[in-house]
Amino acid sequence: MPQDIRISPDGRTFFVADMLADGVHVVDGASFKQIGFIPTGTGAHGLYPSRDGKYLYVANRGTNKMMVKKGVARGSVSVIEFATRKVVQTWPIPDGGSPDMGNVSADGKYLWLSGRFDDEVYRINTSSGEVDKIKVGREPHGLAVWPLPGRYSLGHTGNLR
């Protein structure tokens, strides 16, 4: 079940997160044919390119289900290197969690993700993978990161240009 799509920095390849396949389909932009698959983790959901265009962060919810009880999901973030199309790092959410949707900060230092099933938001250091958890209201689904540093909005992911 496709959940998110992003295009490679060179504009030639699509990356499609598939929640039921637990990974990312790689699709040629000219032929629209699948040319690969990258296993990332259970419930691959959101895709977020790094600001330098080297990496693609994949939010793996830790479950394939549409709804789960709080504390059940064991999510992670996979880091795919665009150049090799391989997972180069995986960052588990400590003590479980359900990374869902969000974006990268304007300075590229943090990946912000909603933790839909755990009533929290994750701030993940893109250099170390260190995760900070912030308790928020019930079932945050998406997180828009404004280009102006320090501005965030819970609700749903926005593509800001």
For each predicted feature, which ranges?
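Predominantly soluble domains enriched in secretory-pathway, periplasmic, or organellar proteins
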Residues: M1-R161
